[in-house]
């Protein structure tokens, strides 16, 4: 820890004290938090969707729409019933589902995403049940008619497939008979094969240079 940390803490607290150094370590004590104006959350209007997206600082892709999600939204035809947006981010997919009249639940493992999706729902006057959840263990079998997801394939900088594969298994459990799973992912990933093996009949709906959108039907 270098001395610049003193300056960082001093911007946010009224008093900062540093102990004597020992073995290249120091203890920093800071107290009296300053009241600072926050630039977050930030909102952005998307006229093509007639939606306002809201994001906090750690929300995936901020208040923008990534290319994979755009591909999904272009082709999404969810029908009616109950829907789950798995890994909701800034809430754009959940907002589209809710606007189309589906009873929509949105979950994410990131508290920033949960707060962003709630703010997006409020900004657009939509009723979305937004929850923090790490997976689908809290949902009973056959809970949803439709699941949408743009799943991650890395944890930090390390590629990690196990969480996504576990998510596919859980999706198969919570979907109702005849249910749909819409999944968009990087084209080089083998998720189509895994979806067919773990969930049900899977076909490619659309594909571009970077992303593949699949539709799985139970």
Residue ranges and their predicted role:
Residues 1, 178-184:
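Conserved beta-strand signature within the Rossmann-like core of class I S-adenosyl-L-methionine
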Residues 67-149, 155:
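Conserved SAM/SAH cofactor-binding pocket of Class I
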Residues 182-218:
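C-terminal catalytic and target-recognition region of SAM-dependent MTase-like enzymes
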Residues 17-19, 54, 129-131, 203-205:
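General small-molecule cofactor/ligand-binding pocket signal
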Residues 108-113, 163, 186-187:
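Short beta->alpha hinge that forms the Motif I/post-I loop of the SAM-binding pocket
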Residues 1-32, 167, 192-199, 206-209:
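Accessory substrate-recognition/RNA-binding modules or partner subunits associated with SAM-dependent
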Residues 165-177:
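A short glycine-rich, Lys/Arg-flanked "PGG" loop and its adjoining helix->strand segment in the class I
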Residues 23-81:
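SAM-dependent Rossmann-like transferase core, predominantly class I methyltransferases
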């Amino acid at each position: 820890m270098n001395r610049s940390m003193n300056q960082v803490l001093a911007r946010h607290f009224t008093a900062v004290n540093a102990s004597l150094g020992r073995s290249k370590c120091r203890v920093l004590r800071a107290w009296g938090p300053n009241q600072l104006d926050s630039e977050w959350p930030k909102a952005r209007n998307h006229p093509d969707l007639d939606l306002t997206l809201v994001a906090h600082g750690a929300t995936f892709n901020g208040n923008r729409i990534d290319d994979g999600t755009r591909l999904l939204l272009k082709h999404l035809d969810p029908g009616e019933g109950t829907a789950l947006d798995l890994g909701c981010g800034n809430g754009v997919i959940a907002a589209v589902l809710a606007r189309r009249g589906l009873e929509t639940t949105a979950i994410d493992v990131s508290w920033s995403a949960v707060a962003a999706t709630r703010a997006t729902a409020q900004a657009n006057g939509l009723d979305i049940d937004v929850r923090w959840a790490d997976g689908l263990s809290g949902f009973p079998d056959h809970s949803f008619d439709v699941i949408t997801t743009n799943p991650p394939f890395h944890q930090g900088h390390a590629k990690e497939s196990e969480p996504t594969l576990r998510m596919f298994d859980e999706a198969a459990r919570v979907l109702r008979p005849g249910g749909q799973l819409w999944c968009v992912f990087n084209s080089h990933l083998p998720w189509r094969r895994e979806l067919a093996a773990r969930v049900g009949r899977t076909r490619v709906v659309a594909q571009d240079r970077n992303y593949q959108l699949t539709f799985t039907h139970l």
